[in-house]
Regions:
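Short, well-ordered loop/turn sites that connect or cap secondary structure elements
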Residues: 31-34, 121, 211
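Residues in the short beta-alpha loop(s) of Rossmann-like NAD(P)-binding domains
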Residues: 156, 223, 249
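Glycine-rich cofactor phosphate-binding loops and adjacent beta1-alpha1 units
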Residues: 119, 161, 166-242
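Residue-level marker of beta-strand positions
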Residues: 16, 37-38, 52, 83, ...
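Mid-domain Rossmann-like dinucleotide-binding core that forms the NAD(H)/NADP(H) cofactor-binding site
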Residues: 36, 95-176, 181
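NAD(P)H dinucleotide-binding glycine-rich loop of Rossmann-like/cofactor-binding domains
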Residues: 47-130
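C-terminal hydrophobic helical "lid"/dimerization subdomain
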Residues: 205-209, 250-300
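Glycine-rich beta-strand-centered segment in the early N-terminal region that forms part
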Residues: 5-54, 95-97
Length: 300
């Protein structure tokens, strides 16, 4: 249990956002950011000075987990509000033709593109996606664009059906079929790229086991609880399998996400379960925590 300390508040959450330019500050040109222009923002607060920031990997910034935004002096990034103060370096302009419901996927898509890049999908690869939540579905969309045959492992029948409508070539119910055996039997070696989007350590172990020699296994999701899995060093040595992680969006992947959405290369609107005005925020949060919903959007 926890109490609520005065230092916890105010807190304005929300980091998957879309809005429009209301005003520009000193030193910012309206020619670059016209008033009323639609935009999204990468709201991860980074130091800009550490080794990773200087090498274009801002998602690994040493300060990224700082609990307070020192500049604004309040915790939280502020997307769940009418106004938000952002640095110009965080802003990405969007075409007016892009719907708000698609534009809010800029940040999660950017996270997934970072993961896809880590997976190094080649044309004709077999790709396994473990988990059929929002992030699993976005992995399906991106893997298909990369020219792969995509198989999803997901126990929920409705989510498996949705994955098929998004282009997934095959789906597995892991409660009925051993996903490791199924993937290996497809081509005799396993999947060249595996993306674990679930927080379950047993599934993380399956992800490693179904990865082909020379393949890439990407741990996209954090694990809860953070329970170690056993891996044979000799197997890793002889298979040359790569096990890696993917966390948050980089500047590079965020720009790519904006480009893909703006050009209509990715259509995430099937992943929106509901749109609520801000005066129905309570109903929105109650809908968001149900297991049968995907993204819930609150408008201001």
């Amino acid at each position: 249990s926890s109490d609520v300390c005065s230092s916890d508040l105010p807190f304005v959450g929300g980091h998957e956002i879309v809005g429009s330019v209301a005003a520009v500050g000193e030193g910012v040109s309206e020619r670059e950011f016209p008033i009323g222009r639609k935009l999204t923002a990468r709201l991860i607060q980074v130091c800009g000075k550490c080794y990773f920031c200087r090498h274009g990997e801002e998602n690994l910034c040493v300060d990224i987990n700082a609990p307070f935004d020192k500049e604004m002096e309040i915790p939280g990034t502020g997307g769940l509000g009418e106004y938000l103060n952002i640095d110009p370096s965080q802003a990405y302009l969007l075409p007016e033709s892009l719907s708000d419901t698609a534009a809010v996927f800029s940040e999660p898509l950017a996270c997934v593109l970072n993961s896809i890049e880590r997976g190094q999908i080649a044309l004709g690869d077999d790709v396994a996606v473990l988990g059929g939540g929002i992030m699993g579905m976005l992995h399906v969309l991106c893997a298909k664009l990369s020219g792969a045959r995509v198989i999803m492992s997901e126990p929920d029948a409705e989510r498996r059906a949705l994955a098929k409508t998004l282009g997934c070539d095959d789906t597995i119910n892991p409660m009925e079929t051993n996903p490791v055996d199924y993937i290996k039997n497809l081509n005799g070696i396993g999947a060249e790229a595996v993306f674990n989007t679930t927080p379950i350590s047993a599934v993380a172990k399956q992800a490693v086991e179904m990865t082909a020699p020379l393949g890439r296994c990407v741990m996209y999701s954090s694990q809860h609880p953070d329970k170690p899995i056993e891996i044979s060093p000799n197997w890793l040595h002889s298979s040359e399998t790569v096990i890696t992680g993917a966390v948050s969006p980089s500047v590079r992947s965020f720009q790519r996400a904006v480009n893909m959405l703006s050009k209509g290369l990715i259509d995430p609107e099937k992943l929106v379960s509901g749109v609520y005005p801000c005066n129905q925020a309570q109903e929105a949060f109650e809908a968001a925590i149900r297991p049968d919903t995907f993204r819930i959007i609150i408008t201001f």
